[in-house]
Amino acid sequence: MDKLIKYFESNLGKRVLEAYKRGNKVFRELPFYTEINVSNVDESLSNDVSEEKVRLQGVIDCFFQDVDDKIVLLDYKTDYIPKGGLNEFVDKYRVQLKYYKEALEKITECDVTECYLYSFYINKEILVEI
């Protein structure tokens, strides 16, 4: 329970609550199916197939509409992060967030302006540049 309280005390958790209080939609556990270019999966493929599509499915943990209708994407993680391992942790999930961002922009027809990982292991929000 402490981890959950710490999340809602974080800046990101407060933003989620504020969005909800303003009446903006806060979405959780949104399943999605979309198609992406195969070149997004493997950049080494030849140009002959780079525009081919592959189907991608997943579940977006959370996103919300912030002020000015900006969409903020969140992905919650519980992984162990060794001391000094934060950059590796972020890099491990950067591609996943990229795919989620692309899917969410197709679904909502809005730009996703911020992407975050929230680590319950270290009780920290991490802004991820995509």
What residue spans do the PLM features occupy?
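Structural signature of nuclease core domains in nucleic-acid processing machines
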Residues: 1-130
